[in-house]
């Protein structure tokens, strides 16, 4: 699994000109699911996301987590994060999981985050053409890959 976490002042996702979800201060998470991904990847990511300290404390130091600030999370599926660009200039999606694998993992990821946060997370709609708006805060952007845990 690959994610991009963006610290935001607010974010929203719109589908067919209708707002599906919106959040205030928190994280916009773009989620790409690969063919080899499992529930173990979800568990690792959720622990990292919940514990990640990228919000400022009283001294202006990034020392507070999403839980500490009582922030919100919006998760948007994005298979393009699994792009392979090894050959040529047109990306390939051979590493992206098929729908029958990725939809249950996407739903489980969102449920696990909600459970860890103790409140619902906002979501997009898997496979839909979505318009995502956000106001980056910082900007602070973190990329994580469960196959390359650095």
What is each PLM-predicted segment?
Residues 1-89, 104-150:
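N-terminal, polar/charged subdomain of small-to-medium soluble alpha/beta proteins
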Residues 87-101:
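A charged helix-plus-loop insertion that forms the helical arch/lid used to bind
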């Amino acid at each position: 699994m690959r994610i991009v976490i963006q610290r935001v002042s607010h974010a929203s996702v719109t589908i067919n000109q209708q707002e599906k979800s919106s959040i205030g201060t928190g994280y916009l998470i773009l989620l790409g699911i690969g063919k080899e991904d499992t529930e173990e990847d979800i568990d690792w990511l959720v622990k990292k996301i919940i514990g990640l300290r990228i919000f400022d404390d009283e001294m202006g130091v990034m020392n507070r987590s999403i839980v500490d600030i009582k922030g919100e999370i919006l998760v948007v599926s994005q298979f393009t994060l699994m792009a392979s660009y090894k050959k040529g200039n047109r990306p390939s999606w051979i590493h992206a999981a098929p729908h029958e694998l990725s939809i249950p993992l996407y739903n489980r990821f969102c449920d696990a985050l909600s459970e860890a946060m103790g409140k619902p997370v906002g979501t997009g709609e898997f496979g839909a053409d979505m318009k995502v708006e956000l106001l980056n805060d910082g900007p602070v952007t973190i990329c994580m890959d469960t196959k390359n845990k650095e």
